[in-house]
Amino acid sequence: RELVENRLVREVELTSKSISAFWGKEMKVKAAVLLPGSWYEQPGREYPVRYNIAGYGGRYTRVNRLVNDPAFFDWWRSGDAPQIINVFLDGEGPFGDSYQMDSDNSGPYGANLTEELIPYIEREYRGLGTPASRFVDGCSTGGWVSLALQLYYPDFFNGVWSYSPDAIEFENYQLVNIYEDDNEYINEWGNLRPLARDLYGDPMMTVKDFLQFENVLGWSNTYVTSGSQFSAHTALYSPKGADGLPAPMFDPHTGEIDRAVAEHWKKYDMKVLLQENWPELGPKLQGKIYIWMGD
């Protein structure tokens, strides 16, 4: 995957000290930078920075679509566009999308982002380098990641625009309450749980059907190593299992929920985070959170 050649586009490839130490080998992270139209004409100017996270598995090369769109790029180079640096983070991770957060399985992706990658980008491309000038946004997986970054690093970012995020609290993980329900696949009435619905509200697919597909994709014959959605969730939220892989929160074949693993997921449950830390977090988050979700 190559970036479009353009004087306002930069490719960042950084060897992460923290992630490399976790894995015991060289690990690199990537990003694309879209500079503002005035960047060359005002060489002494510093800029605020917007960090964008894509939907599941989205790569940093998505900047190409914007630069190759004449209407967008003509506007971007004009004086009408906001003079802000855009950074497109990369979704690649060891078990699918990295989710840009620290985890027991993928490693310290959150520390890498806030302590290595972002400081490097802001030094290299004249970002203002202050929390007040740093913003984050994304849709779907990116909606979850952007909101999590603002909540878990409240002093580092100054605002989040989160669109249609993944489940942000696990009493409603899709249609499952992982703390109380017994089975991911089957509800209390013995029916298969739907995963998605069509425009008319009718179920299109069950959770079990989707997970059977991920089980086939996984090199361990389970969704844990599929590199798909539930693989990435498991890598992020779960502890490391006895086999060295992320511990599944539910049995890949029967759907039975492991209560101990579900309890470990709590530290990534944003509702729990806010309920337990609201006196401290509330004042820091005032005016910084914007969430947009459809029906």
Placement of each model-derived feature along the sequence:
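Non-catalytic cap/lid and distal C-terminal segments of serine-dependent acyl enzymes
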Residues: 1-295
